[in-house]
C-alpha cells in the first residue's frame, strides 16, 4: 500500500498542529494558508486552511496539484537550494489570485513550502513574508 505523502517525515502527526497555527494566520490575513509538498514534478497541497470571516477567498482542496514551475508554492519549493527566502506570484494558477510562499528548509528529503494565497491581488510583502517564513521555519523545526 502507498504511504501518505510526507509520512516518512512524520508530516501527518504534525499536520494538526500546523493547521491550528495556520488558522490564526489565515484569520488575521484573510487569506488561505497552505502546506504544499513536491510529488515528482508537481506541487501537492497537503493541508489547506481558509479564513472564516471573509466574503470571498481562494478555496482549493487538499490533494490539488499543479506544476512545480507555477504558483508561489511550487516556486518556493524550487528555492530550497538558493538564498531567496520566498516566492511571490500573481495569476499563474488562477486569474486574480496572488500567492506568497516560503520553502521548508533543513529536513532531509523533504521538498515543501508554506504559503498564503489571496484574491485581492495585493500582498503586503513587508508584513506577510516574515510571518510565512517563520511558519515554514516552524514546520522544518517540528519535522527534524
Map each language-model feature to its residues.
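Conserved GNAT-family N-acetyltransferase fold
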Residues: 47, 102, 114
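Juxtadomain coupling helices with adjacent low-complexity linkers
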Residues: 83-90, 94-96, 111-144
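Short beta-strand segments
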Residues: 36, 103, 117
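Amphipathic alpha-helical effector-binding/dimerization core
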Residues: 4-81
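Arg/Lys-rich, alpha-helical DNA-contact motif
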Residues: 1
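A short, hydrophobic, proline-anchored segment that marks a local hinge/packing element in signaling
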Residues: 99-108
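Active-site donor-binding loop signature of nucleotide-sugar glycosyltransferases
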Residues: 48, 106, 118
Amino acid at each position: 500500500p502507498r504511504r501518505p505523502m510526507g509520512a516518512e517525515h512524520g508530516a501527518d502527526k504534525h499536520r494538526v498542529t500546523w493547521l491550528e497555527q495556520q488558522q490564526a494566520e489565515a484569520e488575521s490575513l484573510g487569506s488561505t494558508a497552505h502546506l504544499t509538498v513536491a510529488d515528482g514534478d508537481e506541487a501537492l497541497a497537503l493541508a489547506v486552511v481558509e479564513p472564516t470571516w471573509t466574503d470571498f477567498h481562494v478555496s482549493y482542496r487538499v490533494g490539488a496539484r499543479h506544476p512545480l514551475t507555477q504558483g508561489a508554492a511550487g516556486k518556493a519549493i524550487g528555492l530550497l537550494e538558493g538564498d531567496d527566502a520566498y516566492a511571490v506570484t500573481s495569476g499563474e494558477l488562477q486569474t486574480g489570485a496572488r500567492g506568497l510562499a516560503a520553502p521548508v528548509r533543513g529536513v532531509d528529503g523533504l521538498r515543501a513550502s508554506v504559503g498564503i494565497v489571496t484574491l485581492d491581488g495585493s500582498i503586503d510583502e513587508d508584513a506577510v513574508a516574515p510571518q510565512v517564513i517563520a511558519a515554514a521555519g516552524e514546520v522544518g523545526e517540528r519535522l527534524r
